[in-house]
Amino acid sequence: MKTKIWIALIALYIVWGSTYLAIRFAVETIPPFLQAGLRFLISGLILVLWRRAAGDAMPTRPQWKSLAIIGTLLLLGGNGLVSFAEQRIASGVAALIVGTVPLWLVLIEALRPGGVKPTWRAIIGLIIGFGGIYLLVGPSELTGKLQFDAIGTFAVIAASFLWSIGSIYSRSAELPKSAWMMTGGEMVSGSLLIFMVSLILGEWKSFNPADVSSTSWLALLYLITFGSMIGFVAYIWLLQNAPISLVATYAYVNPLVAVLLGNWLAQEALTSRILIAAGIIIGSVIFINSARQASAGREAKPVVPDKEEIASSG
């Protein structure tokens, strides 16, 4: 069993760590929101039809409403904005910024009415983590300008914020009991909203399938099969068979995998500043999650990672 667990965990690291690079290749010749819509519509329909055939109940009308809200926040606001941003900034940088979702979760929980107030350890982790973001994308010492494209940078920051809002909302929303059906319904409803944005932005008018490169088509296929389906299957299996603390390591490893793959396969810059910022950001996430584990331990409750916190799914 240990061998299977490690195989699944390494597969999860590689698959979800590589989705950011796959998005970059996909949006080279496919409009970003159209790409995201196609990815989630196909993946979602496969999951819904599969689980319905397996006997899972279809979502009720109130559940579809909740799934549509989550799809708007996570898939349109989260993945859609990341896809848009990766036309402007490196995939590894996008992954590092999205890796701060646990920081936003703590901050939003602290500020919302009735939310959970952070411990001092969590507050220290927040300060360190957001300091890492500033180091990553802040002004250059030489030019005084931002390290990366401002629009792309702020789009990913907004995506991280919306991911966090969607995650917190999902904890109290009425959702299907089946994690598979929930994910499929979220993808289907989210994809329809993404297509609407794509239509409004005029992506369909300028899109010609003949102009899409083979690299972009293969990247989209990879995102559908591996990023949205195989990766999630591995994740659910790990939750059922491996220690939660081990499964949660995806939040630390995936951004690092994304940075290294981007440098290796797309020749993205890998400067000392990026490496130091990566260490600070990932370290702060570990620090905050350890604080959550300690707090949960005092309350005799395990900290279970939410599916909606999977930033690395891209």
List each language-model region with its residue ranges.
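C-terminal-most transmembrane helix of multi-pass membrane proteins
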Residues: A36, F40, S216-L218, Y252-G314
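Membrane-interface helix-cap regions at the ends of transmembrane helices
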Residues: S18, A22-F25, T29, S43-P59, ...
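Hydrophobic transmembrane alpha-helices of multi-pass small-molecule transport proteins
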Residues: L47, A68, T100, P118-S140, ...
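C-terminal transmembrane-helix exit sites in multi-pass transporters
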Residues: I46-M58, P102-I127, L256-L275
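Hydrophobic/aromatic residues within transmembrane alpha-helices
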Residues: A26, Q35, R39, A85, ...
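Hydrophobic alpha-helical transmembrane segments of multi-pass integral membrane proteins
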Residues: I7-A8, L34-L49, I69, A122-L135, ...
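Specific transmembrane alpha-helical segments of multi-pass solute transporters/efflux pumps
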Residues: V15, T19-Y20, V48-V98, I108, ...
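Alpha-helical transmembrane segments of compact multi-pass small-molecule transporters, enriched
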Residues: I42-I46, I97-L111, S189-L193, L218, ...
